[in-house]
């Protein structure tokens, strides 16, 4: 009887240890967490810095009728922050699909590089177009972006969710939800670059 009890206890300990290992393995590493948070913080600061002190004439200036103004770039950054994070949250509420990890072709570094490469032109979907956003001013859009990004950083600091085993299908291929958080941050970098290109135009108002 004692042998049997010891055997059951050992089996229980093995199961618990095994489960603990599984849970630990499914949580993003400290290195991954730090990388995502740093990217989120840095790109947030860049957006804020890029529009600081600009006049109405400057934020509304367009290099051409079919090009975005500084204000429109911020509208796009803000709505993308919301919509892409909504996608992440929806994916995390669904069942994990680790079997789809084999469909992921991009490393974290490759994804960031592609997103931040402005030579790779991509037409945005209609719901992300500045004129289709709910914002009425740059101030409103910027505040919405800042509040959401702050919440997203808090989430990444504390989450124990299995981001790597929730895979989502994007127009360019499959990525996991950790990569989606990197995509959100690098997307804002991409359009901060665009915004700075507008500011660098020879015709950009002096004030």
Give the label of every model feature segment.
Residues 1-9:
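Bacterial N-terminal signal peptides that target proteins for export
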Residues 8-11, 18-19:
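Cleavable N-terminal signal peptides
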Residues 16-35, 86-143, 175, 202-207:
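Short, helix-capping/interhelical loops that line the mouth of catalytic, cofactor-
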Residues 26-67:
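Start-of-domain marker
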Residues 36, 43, 47, 69-70, ...:
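Stable alpha-helical elements in mature extracytoplasmic
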Residues 51-64, 123-136, 150-180:
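Acidic interhelical loop/turn segments
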Residues 61-110, 158-207:
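Short, contiguous alpha-helical
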């Amino acid at each position: 009887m004692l042998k049997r009890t010891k055997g059951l206890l050992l089996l229980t300990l093995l199961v618990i240890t095994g489960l603990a290992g599984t849970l630990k393995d499914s949580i993003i590493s400290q290195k991954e967490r730090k990388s995502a948070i740093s990217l989120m913080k840095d790109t947030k600061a860049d957006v804020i810095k890029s529009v600081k002190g600009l006049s109405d004439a400057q934020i509304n200036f367009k290099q051409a009728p079919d090009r975005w103004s500084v204000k429109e770039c911020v509208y796009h950054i803000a709505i993308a922050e919301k919509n892409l994070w909504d996608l992440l949250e929806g994916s995390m509420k669904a069942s994990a699909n680790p079997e789809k990890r084999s469909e992921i072709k991009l490393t974290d570094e490759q994804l960031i590089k592609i997103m931040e490469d402005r030579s790779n032109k991509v037409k945005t979907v209609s719901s992300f177009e500045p004129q289709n956003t709910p914002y009425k001013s740059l101030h409103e859009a910027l505040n919405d972006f800042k509040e959401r990004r702050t919440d997203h950083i808090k989430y990444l600091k504390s989450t124990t969710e299995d981001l790597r085993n929730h895979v989502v299908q994007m127009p360019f291929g499959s990525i996991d939800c950790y990569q989606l958080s990197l995509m959100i941050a690098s997307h804002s970098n991409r359009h901060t670059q665009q915004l700075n290109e507008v500011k660098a135009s020879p015709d950009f108002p002096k004030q």
